[in-house]
Regions:
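Membrane-proximal interfacial segments on either side of biological membranes
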Residues: 1-90, 102-173
């Protein structure tokens, strides 16, 4: 048997189907379809995955800086790797707009960071951090989104968001 292998695949996915399948929060604010490509690497019984898309054809009614017209490309890269001690690391990069890193062990979130704009994307020692550094930040729009009072299903049917341990927001004065 082989100890390593690689697979390259691609296709087009509809955002509403992904939202429904994964229970993504605020999924009612995303629409459209986009082409994607993926590479799966298997080495020594560990699987690493990379998914990339230009999100052309997907629109977002999320608050800035995550709003996007369907006709505008925005590079998305999602990586899943096996980290130390059986942990899984998930890293997502959305152009120069956002980054996120999640560390999970046995499907339990151990620590994570979400960074918008030029926010620091380093993982906290423990818990969940959100760091935002953008020219303008609409706190009311984000509060509405996080409260689940947006348009559409109002957040019903989506997975709940974890409690935040660190929140940092920086805007020019």
């Amino acid at each position: 048997h082989a100890d390593k292998g690689a697979v390259q695949v691609g296709g087009t996915s509809n955002v509403s189907e992904l939202v429904q399948h994964f229970g993504l929060p605020a999924g009612d604010r995303l629409a459209g379809s986009a082409a994607w490509k993926s590479s799966i690497d298997i080495k020594h019984h560990q699987t690493d995955l990379v998914i990339e898309s230009d999100l052309l054809g997907v629109s977002s009614r999320l608050p800035e800086p995550l709003a996007k017209a369907a006709t505008s490309p925005l590079a998305l890269r999602v990586e899943k790797t096996t980290a130390e001690a059986g942990r899984q690391q998930y890293r997502a990069t959305l152009g120069n707009v956002a980054q996120a890193v999640f560390i999970k062990r046995a499907e339990v979130l151990e620590r994570a960071v979400v960074a918008l704009g030029t926010g620091d994307a380093s993982l906290p020692e423990r818990g969940v951090a959100v760091r935002i550094a953008v020219p303008q930040f609409d706190a009311d729009a984000w509060k509405e989104l996080l409260a689940g009072s947006g348009n559409g299903n109002g957040g019903r049917g989506s997975k709940s968001l974890p409690a935040l341990d660190v929140v940092s927001i920086k805007t020019p004065t």
